[in-house]
Amino acid sequence: MIITFNKYQGTGNDFILIDNRKLIFPKDNIHLIEKMCSRKFGIGADGLILLENSDTVDFKMVYFNSDGNLGSMCGNGGRCIVHFANFLNIINNNTIFEATDGYHKGFFVNEMISLKMNDVSKIDLRTDYLYLDTGSPHHVEMVNELENFNVEEKGAFLRNHLYGIDGSNINFVEQINDNCFKVRTYERGVEAETLSCGTGATAVAIAMFELKKTSFNHIQLKTKGGNLSVEFEKNNLIYQNIYLKGPAKLIYKGDWEC
């Protein structure tokens, strides 16, 4: 069996994208997905994304973590699949698509892709961190000297010991100025730090506004893989009209024989 794939990246968060409108990809083959995502034995990626037909909107996004299991919403992956759908001539410059957490709008904006995220109404504020769900669960914690912080060790500990078997993504944040923050994220399912996390950047932007670290509702996030921006409105304790914006690029195409 030959599987044609497209390798994408959005601020260093990289994905294998596959056109599965004919439903030929073996989605229950966890080992295959894990091997394709392996950086030593496969293509190498933080996750694998299938584009499938939808009965109600332009297309459906099915996301797998690099461990082969179905994942929750992926913001950078969502931006990449919008680019992929345009590449396949399914859409022009805007779209509505279906994902595991509901429907999302996507737009091309000056070679960037802006993705509308779902509303956020529940934020758990603790002494040292915040917890919220932006399509995926996120722990947000401020630290000093983020550049030298041991994200892998502390992230793995919190992911496994604080959040149990289901786990959570863990974000560490350092403020740069009034509306700019540096972010590093340990992602569950990848079980490592990634160069960027879109739902994590979204969670950080909302968390910083909630903590009154910023009064801006258009926030810049600097990740190891590049820059993202998040804008939103807060109405009656609910964060709405949340948009994640950043680049999405096709790196190469190829065929996988299995």
Give the ranges of each region predicted by the language model.
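A glycine-rich beta-to-alpha transition motif near the start of alpha/beta enzyme domains, typified by
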Residues: 1-110, 140-258
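Active-site glycine-rich loop that binds ribose-phosphate moieties when present
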Residues: 115-128, 153-158
